[in-house]
From Swiss-Prot:
Belongs to the OpgD/OpgG family. InterPro entries: Gal_mutarotase_sf_dom, GH-type_carb-bd, Glucan_biosyn_MdoG/MdoD, Glucan_biosyn_MdoG_C, Ig-like_fold, Ig_E-set, MdoG_OpgG. Pathway: Glycan metabolism; osmoregulated periplasmic glucan (OPG) biosynthesis. This is Glucans biosynthesis protein G. It comes from Shewanella baltica (strain OS195). PANTHER family: GLUCANS BIOSYNTHESIS PROTEIN (PTHR30504), GLUCANS BIOSYNTHESIS PROTEIN G (PTHR30504:SF2). It is found in: Periplasm. Its main location: periplasm. One of its GO terms (molecular function) is carbohydrate binding.
Length: 542
């Protein structure tokens, strides 16, 4: 079973490890696919991009050369890069670093006294990550002040090595594998981690009081595709020195892969919900027909709603428990996540989506009982498109996993029309990371859902589903009417009742699958007085 291998968030460098293994999901024996119960589209065959392998010149700076810098600098570099065949850069590490074990890599730590902007009165600090272990790619970094960028060369003085490391750190400019940004997010005078860029185009952030959980990426290409996934990489970063009295830090990034080059700008504002405004320009080398914008990656092992065969003392284990969507029609949709027995892909068609994201709704420690992982503190991530994103689908990929160390959930926006080769494609969106991100939930929203066999006295194929709805504000005397639809099988015994414990209502119904192996479920509540109520969606599989 293959999925995204995670770095446990309790580790000091707080980044994804071995994030490039999702391309091997083709080893899975089957894929369940549905687009709101519609068949998958036929995708034309695309000629693969030309790839050239080129060794690096020692100490060569390719992108972040010291010199003038403005808002168009990275866009121009990306455009020039895309006009040429993709170059698979080779920046070999000294053998000792290339073969580091997990424990050895952890033993190379950034020296906090060497943090960028330390003791300069700046509300942010930056620390770099060493190359080694799984993080072999050379990442260039520059610091921008005013209209000038200065290349940040690797120096061993930035790092300390513990007793596990037996070799001296190199003196050559071998670059970095990424960096993290610190801020006084939780306590004045204490610089806690706020955001991390490391591994391919992965990054993740925290709101106040959060612990690292789900991640995002610059771009998703060919996710869960039979050819294998393509992972673009952020090759270089330009980090603007923040103003002393500002709550904003700006990061520019250069993205590259065999299929596309791109320029990104991340404007980061920490807070209870950390806001990140993303502006991106893509320059495809080939037609991008299997592209995902604003991708998020998370983990779902089990909960009350899925995979009851897991032998675990913890009631629930997940970084996110549902996909929330606010579509172009103003409909709020909640789709609980699942850990399926075979890889499955769902696509929710839309026109001009207003928002979507992977959400961690369950915030009660008692639901997890994990003193180390503290899943109740994992952030949610809400994506708000800027401008009209047109027609397309919110895509959800769920990959089977037997362990919480693997990220097995991916969501993104897939445009209906491919992005042509040789074009210039702009898009923008806002990300909100936090315990209660700026997700526009309905006045009546799902707080919990669970399923089990319908007959507690004997084995039966019939399934019982229970969905709890919570009301924002006081309860009224109104009783809603429930409507439950299924793409197959038979729905029976639909019951709606008040649930004072949740300040809302409980919907219960039974499903007789008959001979079906996959059934799409949809439940709605209708009130006498119109209210904005979340629609509950779920995919039942054998």
């Amino acid at each position: 079973m293959v999925s995204l291998l995670r770095c446990p968030s309790s580790k000091p460098y707080s980044s994804l490890i071995c994030s490039l293994t999702l391309g091997a999901v083709v080893a899975l024996s089957g894929v369940a696919y549905a687009e709101e119960t519609k068949p998958a589209e036929t995708v034309p065959v695309v000629t693969p991009p030309k790839v050239i392998s080129q060794p690096a010149t020692k100490n060569q700076v390719r992108f972040t050369k010291t010199g003038a810098f403005d808002s168009d600098t990275v866009v121009k570099i990306a455009k020039r890069l895309a006009a040429k065949p993709y170059v698979a850069l080779k920046d070999p590490l000294p053998a000792g670093l290339a073969k580091l074990s997990y424990d050895e890599y952890r033993d190379i730590r950034f020296n906090p006294t060497a943090s960028i902007w330390r003791d300069q009165g700046v509300p942010f600090q930056m620390q770099m990550f060493h190359r080694g272990f799984y993080f072999q790619d050379l990442i260039e970094i520059a610091i921008v002040e005013g209209q000038n960028a200065t290349h940040l060369a690797y120096e061993p003085k930035y790092f300390t090595a513990g007793e596990v490391i037996t070799q001296a750190l190199p003196n050559d400019d071998i670059g970095y594998s990424g960096f993290r940004i610190h801020n006084q997010l939780n306590t004045n005078g204490v610089f806690d981690e706020l955001m991390v860029f490391q591994g391919a185009s992965y990054f993740r952030a925290l709101g106040k009081g959060n612990a690292y959980g789900l991640s995002s990426r610059g771009l998703a290409l060919k996710t869960a595709d039979a050819e294998g996934e393509e992972f673009p990489i952020f090759r270089a970063f330009w980090v603007e020195r923040p103003y002393n009295d500002s709550n904003l830090i700006v990061v520019h990034a250069l993205l590259d892969s065999p299929s596309v080059a791109g320029a990104y700008t991340f404007s980061v504002r920490p807070g209870d919900n950390t806001l990140i405004d993303v502006e991106a320009t893509l320059f495809p080398r080939v037609e991008l027909s299997k592209v995902g914008l604003a991708p998020s990656t998370s983990m779902f092992l089990h909960s009350l709603n899925g995979r009851h065969d897991t032998d675990d003392f913890r009631p629930e284990v997940h970084d996110s428990d549902g996909l929330l969507m606010l579509n172009g029609r103003g409909e709020h949709l909640w789709r609980p996540l699942a850990n399926p027995r075979q890889l499955q892909v769902s696509a929710f068609s839309d026109n001009s989506p207003q928002g979507f994201g992977l959400i961690q709704r369950e915030r009660d420690y008692a639901s997890y009982q994990d003193l180390e992982a503290h899943y109740e503190r994992r952030p949610s991530l809400w994506i708000e498109p800027v401008g009209n994103w047109g027609q397309g689908s919110v895509v959800l990929t769920e990959i089977p996993t037997e362990s919480e160390i693997h990220d097995n959930i991916v969501s993104y926006w897939k445009p209906r029309q491919p992005i042509p080769a040789g074009s210039e494609f702009h898009f923008a969106y806002r990300m909100s990371w936090g315990e209660e991100p700026a997700a526009k939930v309905g006045a009546v929203h799902v707080s919990r859902s669970a399923s089990g066999r319908a007959d507690i006295a004997k084995a039966t194929p019939r399934r019982l589903f229970v969905v709890d709805y919570q009301i924002e504000g006081p309860m009224t005397d109104e009783m809603p009417v429930a409507k439950v639809e299924a793409s197959g099988g038979v729905v029976t015994n639909v019951v709606i009742a008040r649930n004072a414990a949740k300040n809302g209502y409980r919907l219960a119904f039974e499903l007789e699958p008959e001979d079906k192996e996959l059934i799409e479920l949809r439940a709605e509540l209708k009130f006498p007085t119109p209210r904005q109520v979340e629609t509950w969606l779920y995919r039942w599989t054998l």
